UniProtKB/Swiss-Prot annotation:
This is Cytochrome b. Binds 2 heme b groups non-covalently. The chain crosses the membrane at residues 33-53, 77-98, 113-133, 178-198, 226-246, 288-308, 320-340, 347-367. GO terms for molecular function: metal ion binding; ubiquinol-cytochrome-c reductase activity. The lineage of its organism: Eukaryota, Metazoa, Chordata, Craniata, Vertebrata. InterPro entries: Cyt_b/b6_C (IPR005798), Cyt_b/b6_C_sf (IPR036150), Cyt_b/b6_N (IPR005797), Cytb/b6-like_sf (IPR027387), Cytochrome_b (IPR030689), Cytochrome_b_C_euk/bac (IPR048260), Cytochrome_b_N_euk/bac (IPR048259), Di-haem_cyt_TM (IPR016174). The gene is MT-CYB. A ubiquinone binds at residue 201. It comes from the Eukaryota. Heme b b562 binds at residues 83, 182. It is found in: Mitochondrion inner membrane.
Amino acid sequence: MTNIRKTHPLMKIINSSFIDLPAPSNISSWWNFGSLLGICLIIQILTGLFLAMHYTSDTVTAFSSVTHICRDVNYGWLIRYLHANGASMFFICLFLHVGRGLYYGSYMFLETWNIGVLLLFAVMATAFMGYVLPWGQMSFWGATVITNLLSAIPYIGSDLVQWIWGGFSVDKATLTRFFAFHFILPFVIAALAGVHLLFLHETGSNNPSGLASDADKIPFHPYYTIKDILGVLILILVLTCLVLFSPDLLGDPDNYTPANPLNTPPHIKPEWYFLFAYAILRSIPNKLGGVLALVLSILILAFIPLLHTSKQRSMMFRPFSQCLFWILVADLLTLTWIGGQPVEHPFIIIGQLASILYFLLLLVIMPITSLFENNLLKW
């Protein structure tokens, strides 16, 4: 008798995706982050669902409903902090996942990569709207500042901002629609992740060497299921430690003050995972220029396959490109630090230099270095 997992219409999809999937024998722990992102998404959807049962999206009661969740709901504090810090874990995994793709040339799978970029935008939009919901000072002013950036769009800018706000300022209409979008988007993300996997399984996984691995495949289960479970356990351990020992480590103290349109916080800044893009935005004195740089800082990922000039796919055997990759990582960490600093000397000039270096590395220096490495192969 044929095994049910190979014949049942639903089971055979799961079987071909997670059990009998032929996988390269040499993929490292850097390939764990896809499954970790799936776990993060499940954690976020489940905790978010339970939070939505007690949350009210009204400007008068939003802040107190979050307080009510933390004080009066059974394990409400745990659900709330799992959700808040789960977002941070989500972005850590996302950045490492994208970094892995850049380093090992996974962007050569065009459909998979482009859907990944779309997923990154969707997750960032969801996180931004979620940050507005507790209706603290940083929620309100963050929403005001970021939505206001759209007014830089010529001709339709100011109308567009008022359309998004649902009025003449960030108010009840804005909060209600942000809650609605924040609730629906994770399901869109889950669907996109399914398509992401679908395209990945059309080509099969990349591997650290960047070479074809058709001659050396192993079944996904048990080898990589066990490997993924180890990653999941580490993720849950880190998240649990964060939630139980220092839940507010990555948050902003200003968000424990209820939103007040008459009182602007001294330093308006987004959550830590947006600081690198925020630093790029602030480093350009012109409003429209800043907005374009902000969008391009993420959208540039979609152009990476076009900028691939090397004869080799992976950076595994390209020492000069490796050095530049780690300079890029250091540059992004610098931008993240600058994004959290006040707009004053010397932070302004450091931010501007780091922003220029970011775009120069990706658009000019790395492609030219790859061409240079191609010539080294001839010697």
